[in-house]
Amino acid sequence: MSSQFIFEDVPQRNAATFNPEVGYVAFIGKYGQQLNFGVARVFFLNQKKAKMVLHKTAQPSVDLTFGGVKFTVVNNHFPQYVSNPVPDNAITLHRMSGYLARWIADTCKASVLKLAEASAQIVMPLAEVKGCTWADGYTMYLGFAPGAEMFLDAFDFYPLVIEMHRVLKDNMDVNFMKKVLRQRYGTMTAEEWMTQKITEIKAAFNSVGQLAWAKSGFSPAARTFLQQFGINI
């Protein structure tokens, strides 16, 4: 007696339909009235911890509260869920990071007073470890946020060149750059800005090149301390 094995078609995973601009507008439409710099501060200081929590949580959708505001996120960090398709209108931790960074940038661009307020409250951990501060400009500082690569125009190409420096200086696998190299710059496709925006990209690359760029885990104060003993990082 023969056994039967039946195989059915499965939906293709198609990430090409996701539009960050549309996603951002929907995010602001849902949470915009609740956002403030305090919420953003709590999020970025706890983003790594939240990622670890999701990695251990066997739930496809999780409510995370930052600064008193509850966000429902799709959990694509739990090992069994990593390959699950994410709906275009859903929020992941990565998308939320990019959306919040974009919201901060838009708010700072519209008001010098808001820029001063943001710089006094919000800390971007990865930027700080690399020697970047608010004094280097909000587009560079916020460009270190995961997800900022979705909005290359809002961040003056800094998310792109930051990843370049991570490849060159931190030995990051260049394959991690695939996502940023597919992004649009405003209405321009990746193929267009790669040839038409070289001057701007090189300027941003050189600006980031001026940072101390310590290896992760060493703050500017720690580097200065170690230099007194001949240890240069």
Curated annotation (Swiss-Prot):
Chain residues that bind RNA: 12, 15-16, 48, 51, 77, 95, 166, 178-179, 182, 184
Assembly and binders: Homotetramer. Binds the viral genomic RNA.
Effect after changing residue 48 to E: 99% loss of RNA binding and RNA replication activities
Example GO molecular function: RNA binding
Subcellular location: Virion
GO CC, any one term: ribonucleoprotein complex
Source lineage: Viruses, Riboviria, Orthornavirae, Negarnaviricota, Polyploviricotina
Protein name from the UniProt record: Nucleoprotein
Gene that encodes the chain: N
InterPro entries in the record: Bunya_nucleocap (IPR001784), Bunya_nucleocap_C (IPR043011), Bunya_nucleocap_N (IPR043012)
Alphabetically ordered keywords of this record: Ribonucleoprotein, RNA-binding, Viral nucleoprotein, Virion
Superkingdom in the source lineage: Viruses
Protein task: Encapsidates the genome, protecting it from nucleases. The encapsidated genomic RNA is termed the nucleocapsid (NC) and serves as template for transcription and replication. The NC have a helical organization.
Domain notes: The N-terminus and C-terminus are involved in homooligomerization and play an essential role in viral RNA synthesis.
Record family assignment: Belongs to the orthobunyavirus nucleocapsid protein family.
Matches recorded under Pfam families: Bunya_nucleocap
Gene3D superfamilies attached to this UniProt entry: 1.20.142.20, Bunyavirus nucleocapsid (N) protein, C-terminal domain
